[in-house]
Curated annotation (Swiss-Prot):
It comes from Xylella fastidiosa (strain Temecula1 / ATCC 700964). Its EC number is 4.2.1.59, 5.3.3.14. Homodimer. One of its GO terms (cellular component) is cytoplasm. The gene is fabA. It comes from the Bacteria. Its main location: cytoplasm. The keyword Cell cycle does not apply. GO terms for molecular function: (3R)-hydroxyacyl-[acyl-carrier-protein] dehydratase activity; trans-2-decenoyl-acyl-carrier-protein isomerase activity. This is 3-hydroxydecanoyl-[acyl-carrier-protein] dehydratase.
Length: 172
């Protein structure tokens, strides 16, 4: 199977509509919850565990929706949105790699550390996700470590992010 190794915002939004991957019903969130503008690289065999990598970027602009409400007079990107982007990318990796069809759901993470913040004057957020484990049985689970950088400075780190692919989410 031939796969792309980078994706534009338009292609990511096609994933939100269920149009990019014909083999799966997994989707990314649509705007405004899609937390990256492009995937700059995705490979099945990268990273220190040899399980794959996915890197993405978000262009920061002062008019991004979250700056207007979090917080009034003290605008900052909510930390949970950066963490959610890491789960989004982990789920995208599973779908891209051909995991069985399913609906992606965040299952948790082992450790999260915030050491900085994203302010409206920042220019670029970069996400680097390294897959550490993929279980492909009845339930597909991906596990990853990730970091988030703002203007080339690491400010978030997450270890053992877990995403599951469910055939049915009614009892989840």
């Amino acid at each position: 199977m031939s796969r792309q190794h980078a994706y534009s915002r338009e292609e990511l939004l096609a994933t939100a509509r269920g149009e990019l991957f014909s083999h799966s019903n997994a989707r990314l969130p649509n705007d405004p919850m899609l937390m990256f503008d492009r995937i700059t690289e995705i490979y099945a065999d990268g990273g220190s565990h040899g399980k794959g990598i996915v890197n993405a970027e978000l262009d920061i602009r002062p008019d991004l929706w979250f700056f207007g409400c979090h917080f009034l007079g003290d605008p900052v990107m909510p930390g949970c949105l950066g963490l959610d982007a890491m789960w989004q990318l982990t789920g995208f990796f599973l779908t891209w790699s051909g995991a069985t069809p399913g609906y992606g759901r965040a299952l948790g993470c082992g450790e999260v550390k915030f050491t900085g913040q994203v302010l409206p004057n920042a220019k670029l957020v970069r996400y680097e996700v390294e897959m550490t484990k993929i279980i492909n049985r009845t339930l597909v689970i991906g596990q990853a470590n990730a970091r988030m950088l703002v203007d080339n400075r690491e400010i978030y780190f997450a270890k053992d992010l877990r995403v599951g692919m469910f055939n049915n989410t009614e009892s989840f």
